[in-house]
């Protein structure tokens, strides 16, 4: 396993304040964790001129030009997704800064700094798949659902076992989401949402599940979501698939129950190649791919913790065999041994054998395809 921890310079261990780069969703999700450890935010840098001059949680938002003479020796944590991080990283390096010495990504900060400075085992983003059934058959599905040899719903007991195993071994998960297939197809959805909300809500920043909007959840599920502040992320494929009426009905229901939600339409997808045309890479090409991709989402399935949730799905589909180093059997980790539990965090920043054949989500994958194209 290629470990990507232990990259931050020694000075990071002594800090009690940071500068955030980005006043968006990621900062909002992380704010409770920052409060837990009493780390101070000096100010927030943001390129969006409409945010500059305003505040985030009472903290000033300023431009980089206004910030550069105030940074001094303070460390910057970039609060964005991977693609935007690369762009900001280049910008800061062009201005004389050094990655891991002067700044780092939020995922790196969560996994490395919280362990070194606070002794906490924290994860950034974990997905748990609750069903491999779906209402659509997307040719380029990034979970490979149409290519499964056998599809099924996970039972409540299986899902409960997963979350109990993981949450008893880590202190905090910034973003925890339930996926499919189409999660609404699983009759256990309401029960597992309520169980996680009741038992572990204080241990995760954002609790969410992801749907395609083709099925409207029951009122009972909406009430559970409202009670536990559960976020719904809706993937909009209506430009390719005719179901806009269902999407609009779902939107109306979400507004009626005042549910936190995002309805997202992607204009383009990148084809992973697998399983119909898996990528072939030599060692040098693989290293470049890992530099470009480096997904933030880990997987929690079948009582195991996976570096990449997509790699789990590749194996579950019946078309790939993972190496033993690609996952951790959680039952084998002593929940009372914090050093042993830290192996989970180490794997979260690692790699896996599936990377050799997966096109991935990085800038090196330019094999673009239409969104939601059906088989």
Q: Model features per residue range: what roles?
A:
Residues 1-117:
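Hydrophobic, well-ordered beta-alpha structural blocks that scaffold small-molecule cofactor pockets
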Residues 18, 76-78, 176, 207-209, ...:
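Hydrophobic/aromatic residues located in beta-strands of well-ordered beta-sheets
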Residues 20-21, 45, 79, 129, ...:
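Short hydrophobic segments within beta-strands
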Residues 26, 276-375:
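Accessory C-terminal segments flanking Radical SAM cores
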Residues 76-78, 130, 134, 303:
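Generic structural signal for small/hydrophobic residues in well-ordered secondary structure
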Residues 109-211, 216-219:
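Conserved alpha-helical substructure of the radical SAM core
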Residues 186-302, 306-311, 316:
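Conserved AdoMet/S-adenosylmethionine-binding subsite of the radical SAM
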């Amino acid at each position: 396993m290629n470990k990507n921890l232990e990259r931050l310079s020694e000075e990071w261990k002594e800090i009690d304040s940071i500068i955030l780069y980005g006043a968006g969703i990621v900062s909002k999700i992380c704010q409770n964790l920052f409060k837990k450890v009493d780390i101070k935010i000096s100010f927030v840098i943001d390129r969006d001129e409409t945010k500059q001059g305003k505040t985030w949680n009472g903290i000033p938002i300023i431009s980089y030009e206004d910030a550069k003479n105030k940074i001094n020796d303070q460390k910057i944590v970039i609060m964005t997704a991977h693609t935007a991080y690369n762009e900001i990283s280049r910008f800061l390096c062009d201005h004389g800064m050094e990655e891991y010495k002067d700044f780092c990504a939020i995922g790196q900060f969560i996994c490395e700094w919280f362990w070194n400075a606070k002794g906490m085992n924290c994860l950034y983003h974990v997905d748990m798949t609750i069903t491999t059934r779906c209402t659509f058959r997307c040719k380029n599905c990034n979970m490979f659902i149409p290519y499964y040899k056998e599809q099924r719903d996970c039972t409540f007991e299986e899902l409960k076992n997963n979350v109990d195993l993981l949450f008893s071994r880590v202190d905090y998960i910034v973003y925890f989401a339930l996926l499919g297939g189409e999660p609404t197809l699983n009759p256990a959805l309401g029960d597992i949402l309520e169980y996680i909300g009741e038992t572990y809500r204080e241990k995760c920043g954002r609790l969410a599940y992801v749907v395609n909007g083709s099925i409207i959840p029951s009122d009972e599920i909406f009430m559970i979501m409202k009670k536990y502040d559960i976020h719904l992320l809706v993937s909009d494929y209506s430009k390719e698939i005719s179901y806009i009426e269902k999407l609009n009905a779902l939107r109306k229901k979400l507004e009626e129950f005042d549910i936190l939600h995002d309805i997202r339409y992607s204009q383009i997808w990148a084809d992973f190649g697998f399983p119909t045309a898996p990528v072939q890479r030599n060692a040098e090409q693989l290293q470049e791919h890992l530099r470009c991709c480096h997904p933030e989402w880990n997987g929690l399935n079948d009582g195991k913790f996976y570096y990449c949730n997509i790699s789990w799905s590749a194996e579950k589909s019946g078309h790939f065999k993972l190496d033993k180093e690609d996952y951790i059997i959680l039952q084998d980790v002593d929940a009372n041994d914090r050093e042993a539990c830290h192996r989970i965090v180490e794997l979260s920043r690692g790699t896996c054998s599936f990377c050799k054949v997966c096109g991935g989500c990085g800038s090196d994958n330019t094999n673009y395809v239409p969104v939601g194209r059906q088989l």
